Each structure stands twice: as structure tokens, then as C-alpha cells.
């Protein structure tokens, strides 16, 4: 349970915070994911094998947009490879026939992932790093369930499932996170992240 993901947007009285609740199996697989965005009154729900609901209605990915959405958090702004990553994403968008890349700093990890899912094709990712910090399993568990049930892609930077039941730490920094609305986009993101390791 993360009763307040996106503390900074909340303190600033800006959109981008949420309540996030998940149930994770012993093997680390997300079973239930619930996210509530109180600013826009949106409730996302997913249960393994039962799809995704948005405000009580069954919801499916709509990849008809002509724009690629990339949501990022504060840590991305100071990354030395920021400009290269943005250019690579823009080039990828054009290569698959999209008109442009839309870049948004929206809020906490939970809302960033939801925003990318809702604005398909979209993505949100976190670089891996050796030092602890930068997100815990409760920042990723609910949205991992949403993505899996929507048929989208969620993984670590190497393409493996997120380590949501890590015995030695709640932090996810060691393997990063990739959220993408389709497999091709996820693969491109993993290539970008591999160049930064």
C-alpha cells in the first residue's frame, strides 16, 4: 500500500499524486492492482485474468494516437543522457509513423505509469542505479498489474519481470523499470537503457 505516491505534487497542490494498493504473490507476480487519482477522480483496477477497469468500466488499450507519450519523473531531468534519450525516442516515434513525441513530467511513479498507459502509445521508465532509492515495490506493484492485464509491457531494464517480492530490500533501483504500451516500444527503451549502463 502506498497511501500517497507523488508527495511533491501533493505538497505543491498539483496533479500527479495517487493512492496505490496491490497484492503480490510470493513469486513476485502482481495479482491485484488499484490506483486512485483524487485530482481527476479516476479509479484504475486490475485483477489477474480479469482485465482492467477504469471508473468501473472495462478498459482496453487504444493505440490510435499519432503521438508517442513519454512520462518522466524529476530524476530524469538531471540525467547526462537526457537529450540523447529524448532524441532517440523522437526518432523511434517517427520511424513507426507517429507525428511527434510528447514529453510530460506528470508526477509520482504511479500516475506517470497510468498516464503513459492511458495515452498509448506511451512509456515510462526508470534507469537502474547501484545506490538504494528511487522507488520501492509499492511504487510499481499496482501499475505492474494494470499493464499486464491491459496487454502492455512491464519489466526491469533487462526484460525480466519486476522483482516485486525482493527478500533483501523494498527498493527497485538495482534493476530499474520499463513500462510500455507495446513490445516494440519496450524493446527500444531497453536498448536506450542498455547504452546508459
Residue ranges and their predicted role:
Residues 40-44, 55-58, 162, 167:
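Short small/polar-residue motifs
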Residues 1-53:
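DPxDG-like acidic metal-binding loop motif
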Residues 24-28, 39, 48-51, 57, ...:
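Short loop segments at secondary-structure junctions
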Residues 34, 58-62:
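A generic local secondary-structure boundary/capping motif
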Residues 44-47, 56, 81-85:
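A short secondary-structure junction signal
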Residues 62-197:
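An extended, acidic
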Amino acid at each position: 500500500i502506498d497511501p500517497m505516491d507523488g508527495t511533491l505534487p501533493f505538497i505543491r497542490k498539483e496533479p500527479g499524486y495517487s493512492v496505490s494498493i496491490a497484492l503480490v504473490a510470493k513469486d513476485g507476480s502482481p495479482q491485484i492492482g488499484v490506483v486512485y487519482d483524487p485530482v481527476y477522480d479516476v479509479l484504475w483496477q486490475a485483477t489477474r485474468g480479469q482485465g482492467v477497469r477504469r471508473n468501473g468500466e472495462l478498459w482496453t488499450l487504444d493505440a490510435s494516437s499519432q503521438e508517442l507519450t513519454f512520462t518522466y519523473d524529476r530524476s530524469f531531468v538531471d540525467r547526462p543522457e537526457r537529450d540523447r534519450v529524448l532524441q532517440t525516442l523522437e526518432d523511434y516515434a517517427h520511424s513507426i509513423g507517429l507525428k511527434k513525441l510528447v514529453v510530460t513530467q506528470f508526477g509520482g511513479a504511479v500516475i506517470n505509469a497510468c498516464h503513459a498507459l492511458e495515452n498509448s502509445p506511451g512509456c515510462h521508465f526508470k534507469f537502474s542505479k547501484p545506490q538504494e532509492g528511487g522507488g520501492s515495490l509499492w511504487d510499481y506493484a499496482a501499475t505492474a498489474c494494470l499493464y499486464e492485464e491491459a496487454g502492455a509491457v512491464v519489466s526491469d531494464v533487462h526484460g525480466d519481470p519486476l522483482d516485486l517480492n525482493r527478500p533483501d530490500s523494498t527498493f527497485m533501483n538495482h534493476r530499474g523499470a520499463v513500462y510500455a504500451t507495446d513490445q516494440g516500444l519496450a524493446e527500444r527503451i531497453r536498448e536506450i537503457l542498455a547504452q546508459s549502463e
